[in-house]
Amino acid sequence: MLLPRINFEFIDDYIIDNKKISVIKIPSATHTPVSYKNEIYLRIGSNNKLAKEYPEKLRILWNKTSGFNYEETIVREKLTIEEVLNFLDYRTYFKMKGWDENKTSQQINDEMELDGFIVKEENYKFYKVKALGALLLAHNLKDFNLERKAVRIVIYNGITKSSIREQLEGKKGYAIGFENIIKVLKKYLPQEQRSINGRMEVFEFYPQAIIRELIANAIIHQDLSMTGSEIKIEVYDNRVEITNPGKSVIDLWRFYDCNKSRNEKLAYYMRQLKLCEELGSGIDRIVEISELNNLFTPKFIITNEYVNAKLFREKKFEKMVEEDKINILYYHCCFRYSIEDYMTNSSLRNRFLLDNSKPSTDRISNLIKKAKNMKLIKVGPNKSYIPFWAE
């Protein structure tokens, strides 16, 4: 009924004239107006009116009230210097930054205050911890009532959700717990020995570099203001799915070569700590690895409540559904354009590991025609094709 979902908090109950009165705290809208049955309402005088009938009033109201930044919210206060150092893993953080750990408690807290993780209270005796600091450095997110922001890993038997093999709940902040997430996943992701260029090497069905970027991308682009949902990594026999809460701030077909992120400070520190690529290059890097290794390009699904990235194991062209073929075609076109080259029938045949026969050429021609009709690509120079957004 309500989108995004609202967390109603019951503050207290009172008995007045033998009647129970409950005090309920309703948080204000932050990233988008709240809709009821897909409609947004405004109070005009004494009446509730559809906001779409008063677009200018909605714009003015929203501009005045939408300056909320979750990263800056205070998640714990009245902490001593020692308590701050107990709750936040400054040692791992300093090590990742290459800093000297041999500092006084005051010097350490000063560094974290400069980085915007904590702030002194007005009396200068105690500290407040910002959501940014807790989300990155918490020993245990539960200490800050942020346990629902932790990364959850679910391993399934088979290709459906019907049989859960194992379920793992994260508890650490994203920065200090990131490598452990990768380490845990590595145990469950399939790999095999293959002869590559005459040498036996370990072949990863899901390259670690792609998994890292998809997880970092989910962390950076999640909607932190949403309640009751977390980042979820699901491993099936035939695919990996990574889901983050919140509607994407980027259009589905502009993930490539786009540098907009929802949580700017979170993204900044994830890059500083070498946990993800530079701004805007994460998806580009994923596509590059997929292209160079003839792997499935991740398929992204956007809804009003979440973004889901699906990464499939190898699959021959004949066994792919059309939606997956179009997805690979589009990102192949983007990649070729980014290296100052263009997609052709021949390059796309090679991408799908098809031969040069007329049936293969015809199948690729039909696929290109469908992508053109969907307005995902357009004609480039010399019988080539470029992404719809290319100049």
Language-model features: locations:
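Divalent-cation
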Residues: 1-41, 47-49, 139
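Active-site helix-to-loop segments that bind/position phosphate- or nucleotide-bearing substrates
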Residues: 31, 39, 45-226, 235-238, ...
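A short, conserved structural fragment
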Residues: 118, 296, 369-382
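Long, low-complexity, charged/polar intrinsically disordered regions in eukaryotic proteins
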Residues: 141, 273-321
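Glycine-rich/acidic phosphate-handling loop/turn and adjacent ATP-lid/helix
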Residues: 240-274, 315-336
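Short acidic, hydrophobic short linear motifs in intrinsically disordered regions
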Residues: 339-352, 382-383
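Short amphipathic alpha-helical interaction segments
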Residues: 355-370
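Short, cationic-aromatic polyanion-contact patches
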Residues: 379-391
